[in-house]
């Protein structure tokens, strides 16, 4: 499984570590991902999603059904 949020589509970014002497080396900024189990009332089933902290806030704000529909329209859900 790749490190992509299934709700927001967030994925890892690439940047630089900058030392005191300003020498730059490449690094990866990973997304704050975790697996979370939700009860989907409209479908009467449990859903396990791999979401970021921002995705969890979005679900709390607009609801699970609306968030899943939005993610499906944008193509973030693979199932």
UniProtKB/Swiss-Prot annotation:
The keyword Membrane does not apply. InterPro entries: Ribosomal_bL28 (IPR026569), Ribosomal_bL28/bL31-like_sf (IPR034704), Ribosomal_bL28_bact-type (IPR001383), Ribosomal_bL28_sf (IPR037147). It comes from Porphyromonas gingivalis (strain ATCC BAA-308 / W83). Belongs to the bacterial ribosomal protein bL28 family. It comes from the Bacteria. Pfam families: Ribosomal_L28. GO terms for cellular component: ribonucleoprotein complex; ribosome. GO terms for molecular function: structural constituent of ribosome. NCBIfam families: L28 (TIGR00009). The lineage of its organism: Bacteria, Pseudomonadati, Bacteroidota, Bacteroidia, Bacteroidales. Keywords: Ribonucleoprotein, Ribosomal protein. GO terms for biological process: translation. This is Large ribosomal subunit protein bL28.
């Amino acid at each position: 499984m790749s490190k992509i949020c299934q709700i927001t589509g967030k994925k890892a970014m690439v940047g630089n570590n900058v030392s005191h002497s300003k020498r730059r080396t490449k690094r990866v900024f990973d997304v704050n991902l975790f697996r979370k189990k939700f009860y989907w009332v409209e479908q009467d089933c449990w859903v396990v999603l791999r979401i970021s902290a921002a995705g969890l806030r979005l679900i709390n704000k607009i609801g699970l059904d609306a968030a899943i529909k939005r993610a499906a329209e944008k193509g973030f859900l693979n199932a």
